[in-house]
């Protein structure tokens, strides 16, 4: 997409200051781009994950109350009728995809835990599994109205499964936390500490935003930073995961919202006044929220597109700020970043070019002006004349 197409789509003209560009540069601070390479070995062993995996992998969809109910309805329906066909299709679909509320929720839970174990480390995975299990057991109690969209039989079925999974609370021993952190987490912590020292050497207070793609990973990573021996007494960590537009809505994974102890507004307010100096966030903090400029923006996960790249980087607007992207050793992800950087440079060069051809826009403006020339308004008391082309609608 070239500049002219963008201008046409937005019905606008892209302009860049020329006369006062050097003065503007004194107040607009582009962050220094950095990258972190980390080696990702095979995931370490997580006790709670192994226990969860052993149960979820042997679940039989035929035991699910939703499937049992559909089979009961199918027996009562008259074969060959539209109702019979509808129930049969619904039953076949849920058995094939294993996507009943309970089974899909547990599969989502398992995948989230596996991703956290690989990305953040076994300690974070063990903590996440235990916390979600505790919340889920409470929510699955038929006497609680937490899973309001679930039927009591589904809650009882889920509770039976959860009670068969043996999980343990995590150890907060410093050695256990350190040893059970991933190489990626260790690289992040090293980066945060270096950035803080560099910022404070200029007598500036340090603040950072870490962008993470998945909501569950945000929660787990923030918890690790709160308790890791190298960060727990150095950083005051908060997290943002957005509001209710969730891919897990009405499933077991929606329980993770109960792990949020502070409101989004409180977290942002604390970040503004310095009560918190590190925020772990989903893309919710890329735009639209009133978050102050910070010293350091770190992409734990690569941005999915150029818009996300530009918006997250735009949070690093302080003088001497940095924008850091994390890459796995040997990956081809650097090529995407290089492509976005080159595209951005080309766009800046185009809209800053004083010799750029704007005749197509000027011709359109002239056509509009010609159409409006015969529209005028005269003020009787003063004799002044106003033309439509000069009025702001």
Summary of predicted features, one role per range:
Residues 1, 188, 208-210, 221, ...:
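Structural signal for hydrophobic/aromatic residues that build the beta-strand cores
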Residues 2-8, 247-250, 288-291, 306-308, ...:
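Switch/connector loops and helix/strand junctions flanking conserved nucleotide-binding motifs
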Residues 345-393:
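Double-stranded RNA-binding/processing signature
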Residues 6-229:
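Helicase motor interdomain insertion/brace
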Residues 207-211, 217-223, 234-282:
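Conserved helicase ATPase core of P-loop NTP-dependent helicases/translocases
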Residues 277, 283-319:
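Conserved RecA-like helicase motor core of SF1/SF2 enzymes
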Residues 311-343:
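Conserved segment of the helicase C-terminal RecA-like domain
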Residues 242, 302-307, 328-329:
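Short, acidic/turn-prone active-site loops that include or flank metal/cofactor-
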């Amino acid at each position: 997409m070239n500049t002219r197409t963008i201008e046409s789509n937005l019905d606008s003209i892209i302009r860049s200051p020329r006369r006062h560009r050097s003065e503007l540069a004194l107040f607009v601070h582009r962050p220094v781009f950095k990258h972190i390479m980390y080696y990702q070995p095979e995931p370490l062993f997580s006790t709670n994950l192994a226990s969860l995996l052993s149960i979820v992998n042997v679940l039989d969809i035929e035991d699910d109350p939703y499937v049992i109910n559909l089979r009961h309805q199918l027996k009562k329906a008259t074969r060959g009728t539209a109702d019979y066909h509808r129930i049969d299709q619904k039953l076949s679909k849920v058995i094939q995809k294993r996507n009943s509320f309970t089974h899909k929720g547990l599969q989502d839970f398992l995948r989230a835990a596996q991703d956290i174990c690989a990305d953040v480390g076994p300690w974070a995975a063990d903590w996440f599994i235990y916390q979600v299990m505790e919340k889920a057991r409470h929510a699955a109690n038929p006497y609680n109205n937490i899973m309001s969209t679930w039927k009591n039989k589904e809650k009882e079925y889920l509770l039976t499964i959860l009670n068969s999974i043996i999980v343990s609370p995590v150890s907060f021993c410093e050695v256990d936390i350190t040893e059970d952190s991933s190489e990626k987490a260790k690289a992040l912590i090293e980066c945060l500490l270096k950035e803080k020292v560099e910022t404070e050497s200029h007598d500036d207070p340090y603040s950072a935003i870490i962008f993470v793609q998945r909501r569950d990973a945000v929660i787990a990573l923030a918890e690790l930073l709160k308790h890791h021996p190298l960060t727990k007494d150095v950083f005051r960590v908060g997290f943002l995961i957005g509001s209710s537009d969730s891919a897990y809505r009405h499933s077991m994974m929606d329980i993770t919202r109960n792990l949020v102890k502070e409101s989004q507004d409180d977290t942002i307010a604390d970040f503004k006044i310095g009560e918190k100096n590190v925020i772990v966030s989903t893309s919710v903090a890329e735009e639209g929220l009133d978050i102050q400029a910070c010293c350091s923006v770190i992409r734990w996960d690569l941005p999915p597109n150029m818009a996300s790249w530009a918006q997250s980087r735009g949070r690093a607007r302080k003088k001497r700020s940095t924008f850091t992207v994390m890459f796995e050793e040997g990956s081809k992800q650097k090529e995407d970043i290089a492509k976005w950087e080159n595209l951005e440079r080309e766009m800046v060069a185009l809209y800053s070019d004083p010799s750029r051809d704007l005749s197509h826009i000027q011709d359109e403006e002239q056509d509009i002006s010609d159409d409006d020339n015969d529209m005028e308004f005269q003020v009787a008391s003063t004799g002044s004349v106003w033309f439509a082309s000069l009025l702001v609608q």
